[in-house]
Regions:
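Extended alpha-helical coiled-coil "stalk/arm" regions
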Residues: 39-70
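Short, charge-rich amphipathic alpha-helices with coiled-coil/heptad character
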Residues: 2-33
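Long amphipathic alpha-helical coiled-coil segments
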Residues: 39-42, 47, 82-116
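Terminal, low-complexity, charged helical segments
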Residues: 9, 16, 96-99, 119-120
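Short, glycine/alanine-rich amphipathic alpha-helical segment
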Residues: 61-90
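Extended, surface-exposed interaction regions
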Residues: 23-49
Length: 120
């Protein structure tokens, strides 16, 4: 059974050492702040999406359906969607990297427990 590293090189379970777990912990602690910042930015830009849509809706004329369509196709809303999408991509990238490191730690904990119990 192999664990796939994010960079594409395989890692055998026997190679999962305390050093690798330490690397995972360092990676997690070094990305705490940026992870939180990107999560906050995504939330902030979600509000920006609502504001851009509402602003464009209020400026549009026509029926409610027409105003809704104009708001969703406005430049202001498109810019807000682009900003939100870029922030979400950055957040997901760091979130996925952190989840990978957490899986490494979880697997190591399981293997260590199994070794202590003599199951491996």
């Amino acid at each position: 059974m192999e664990i796939e590293e994010t960079k594409g090189n395989g890692m055998n379970l026997e190679q999962l050492t305390e050093n690798r777990v330490e690397e995972a912990l360092i990676k997690l602690s070094s990305t705490d702040e940026s992870h939180a910042a990107w999560a906050g930015q995504v939330k902030y830009l979600e509000e920006g999406l609502k504001q851009a849509k509402s602003h464009s809706f209020l400026l549009a004329e026509g029926t409610v359906a027409e105003r809704e369509a104009k708001a969703l196709s406005s430049v202001k809303y498109a810019e807000a969607v682009l900003a939100w999408t870029e922030a979400l991509k950055a957040f997901k990238k760091i979130d996925n990297e952190r989840n990978h490191e957490m899986r490494i730690i979880d697997i190591w904990l399981t293997l260590s427990s199994n070794r202590r119990q003599g199951n491996m």
